[in-house]
Curated annotation (Swiss-Prot):
It comes from Herpetosiphon aurantiacus (strain ATCC 23779 / DSM 785 / 114-95). The gene is gatB. One of its GO terms (biological process) is glutaminyl-tRNAGln biosynthesis via transamidation. It comes from the Bacteria. Belongs to the GatB/GatE family. GatB subfamily. The keyword Ligase applies. This is Aspartyl/glutamyl-tRNA(Asn/Gln) amidotransferase subunit B. Allows the formation of correctly charged Asn-tRNA(Asn) or Gln-tRNA(Gln) through the transamidation of misacylated Asp-tRNA(Asn) or Glu-tRNA(Gln) in organisms which lack either or both of asparaginyl-tRNA or glutaminyl-tRNA synthetases. The reaction takes place in the presence of glutamine and ATP through an activated phospho-Asp-tRNA(Asn) or phospho-Glu-tRNA(Gln). Heterotrimer of A, B and C subunits. The keyword Metal-binding does not apply. PANTHER family: GLUTAMYL-TRNA GLN AMIDOTRANSFERASE SUBUNIT B MITOCHONDRIAL AND PROKARYOTIC PET112-RELATED, GLUTAMYL-TRNA(GLN) AMIDOTRANSFERASE SUBUNIT B, MITOCHONDRIAL.
Length: 483
């Protein structure tokens, strides 16, 4: 019997705000000492009252609009009650039946080039919990720094049928979250966490199978691995006549397996009811229109425009449109250099600049202070005018990257201007011909590509400063003269 997989994802994204979801407490806890980013609200002291973080509301709406969600006129916070050491109040303020975003979609591109729509059921705001630090078998410690940090949970429809689709969906969603400045995208620090709900059913059966939730996946690679394992595990259970239990399982990366953690709760177990200390939020249509006007051009739209407007390759367009900082940098330089120079601008950024950034472990923001739009435009201009060749241009670029000096200053200081004097290059051509009689013989016997070797010899002798077109013409003239 063949089985069909059904996969839905719940993505928990910490929202980038200065303060926490319901108080003015510092939300930048990542490198802070344990329990140093807390206040009365964070740890649920009696008598404290929550105040909604407006920036978290704004960013949640931005993401919802980017995912083509509806933004209801009213949304409401509720209490989700459960007892756990990392939840000091014994309830979490979240959204239950009135979330801020509903009925969206995200389009992913599959490995075969086809696209697939994945529905977004909802996205709702809540406060994050604290973190447990497990010691030996006798105790665990609780760090409440994370408690109260704004969290946006994005719940997909169960539209995915393969682990690859789940990975592509999560990767695409992360790209949009980071592009909008809603989330840092850091899975290792827990700023972005993904839970998967997965089931299988006999092929052709409409009714879904029993759902299993998988947690503890700290990378998209592990998400895919965990789903592959879990699908195989469930299929094996059914083939052996067993029954799938509705439960929560954790991914063990070292062992490459999922392990049972607890039976899966139902909604009524949490005793949801409206948060009495917070009134419903009214999101006027004017406010939503203002948020829509804030939306930048998203990666997919940029990618398509870079192809049509600038004629870039798909690879370059993808590299340049994927991150907002990179896209803004590229477009700023194109605005200076002109649309006609978009391709050379793209080549320099995706080639030499990315290589040097990777080697130097710097950020683009740091490098952009040295490789300015004016400097890169100037470099493209001197290459186009034939003042320097491509080999020397890379030397100039590296020096510009290192020092921030202008290309003209570097060329003049190092004497790198291209040699186009025919008398000088004619002599260099004669020297190359004299030093390579076998290559000359090959050329004269009809192996015309052999001249490229001679061009290379002249370029080496002139340290890359010779004009290759002039060199080739000089070589042809001298070779023809010796017939």
């Amino acid at each position: 019997m063949k089985y069909t997989a059904t996969i839905g994802l719940e993505v928990h994204a910490q929202i980038l705000t200065k303060s926490k979801m319901f108080s003015g407490c510092n939300a930048a806890y990542a490198s802070a000492p344990a329990n140093s980013c807390i206040d009365e609200v964070s740890i649920g002291l009696p008598g404290t009252l929550p105040v909604v973080n407006q920036e978290a509301i704004r960013k949640a709406a931005l993401l919802g609009l980017a995912l083509n969600c509806e933004i209801p006129e009213y949304c409401e916070f509720s209490r989700k009650s459960y007892t756990y050491p990392d939840l000091p109040k014994a309830w979490q303020i979240t959204m239950y039946d009135k979330p801020i975003c509903i009925n969206g979609e995200l389009e992913i591109t599959l490995g075969n080039g086809e696209t697939k729509r994945v529905g977004i059921t909802r996205a709702h705001l809540e406060e994050d919990t604290g973190m447990l630090q497990h010691g030996d078998e006798t105790h665990s410690l609780v760090d409440y720094n994370r408690s109260g940090v704004p969290l946006l949970e994005i719940v997909s429809e169960p539209d995915m049928t393969t682990p690859e689709e789940a990975r592509l969906y999560a990767t695409k969603l992360r790209q949009i979250l980071v592009f909008l400045g809603v989330n840092s995208g850091n899975l290792e620090e827990g700023a972005l966490r993904v839970d998967a709900n997965v089931s299988i059913r006999p092929e052709g059966q409409k009714e879904f199978g029993t759902k299993v939730e998988i947690k503890n996946m700290n990378s998209f690679r592990n998400l895919e691995r965990a789903l592959v394992y879990e699908l195989e595990r469930q299929e094996k259970v059914l083939r052996e006549g067993g029954t799938i239990i509705q439960e929560t399982r954790g991914w063990d990366d070292a062992a490459g397996i999922t392990l049972s953690q607890r039976s899966k709760e139902h909604a009524h177990d949490y005793r949801y009811f409206p948060e009495p200390d917070l009134p419903p939020l009214e999101l006027s249509r004017e406010w939503v229109a203002e948020r829509r006007a804030e939306l930048p051009e998203l990666p997919d739209a940029k990618f398509a425009r870079y192809l049509s407007e600038f004629g870039l390759s798909k690879q370059d367009a993808a590299l340049l449109s994927g991150e907002r900082e990179t896209a803004d940098y590229f477009e700023t330089i194109v605005a200076t250099a002109g649309a006609a120079n978009a391709k050379p601008v793209a080549n320099w950024i995706t080639g030499e600049l990315f290589r040097l950034i990777k080697d130097g472990a710097e950020t683009l923001a740091e490098v952009a202070k040295r490789v300015t739009p004016a400097n890169l435009t100037s470099l493209i201009d001197v290459v186009a005018k034939g003042e320097i060749g491509s080999t020397v241009a890379k030397q100039v670029f590296e020096e510009m990257y290192r020092t921030g000096e202008t290309p003209t200053a570097i060329i003049n200081a190092k004497g790198l201007r291209q040699i186009s004097d025919s008398s000088v290059l004619t002599q260099a051509a004669r020297d190359a011909i004299a030093a390579n009689p076998k290559v000359v013989a090959d050329y004269k016997s009809g192996k015309l590509p052999a001249i490229k070797f001679l061009v290379g010899q002249v370029m080496r002798a002139t340290k890359g400063q010779a004009n290759p077109q002039v060199v080739e013409e000089a070589l042809k003239t001298e070779l023809d003269a010796t017939n």
